[in-house]
Amino acid sequence: MTMAKSADIRPGITLACTECKERNYITTKNRRNTPDRLELKKFCPRCGKQTVHRETR
């Protein structure tokens, strides 16, 4: 058996604004701790305010 690569456990994801749908942030997440889609409150430069950003595939 081979060891899992870090990219398998921590894949790169894109966060998109839920209001204007613009993809503003690129980050990684731990698939074991958060198997469902990530939701974070981040600043959207297009909206000019803090909005909920959801993980896109």
Curated annotation (Swiss-Prot):
Query: Keywords for this entry?
Result: Ribonucleoprotein, Ribosomal protein
GO MF terms on file? structural constituent of ribosome
User: Which Pfam family, any one of them, does this sequence belong to?
Assistant: Ribosomal_L33
Keyword Isomerase listed? The answer is: no
Does this UniProt record's set of keywords contain RNA-binding? no
Q: What Gene Ontology cellular-component terms does the record carry?
A: cytoplasm; ribonucleoprotein complex; ribosome
Q: Which InterPro entries match?
A: Ribosomal_bL33, Ribosomal_bL33_CS, Ribosomal_bL33_sf, Ribosomal_zn-bd
Domain of life (superkingdom): Bacteria
A Gene Ontology biological process noted in the UniProt record is: translation
Family assignment?
Belongs to the bacterial ribosomal protein bL33 family.
- Identification of the protein by name: Large ribosomal subunit protein bL33
Q: What gene does the UniProt entry assign to this protein?
A: rpmG
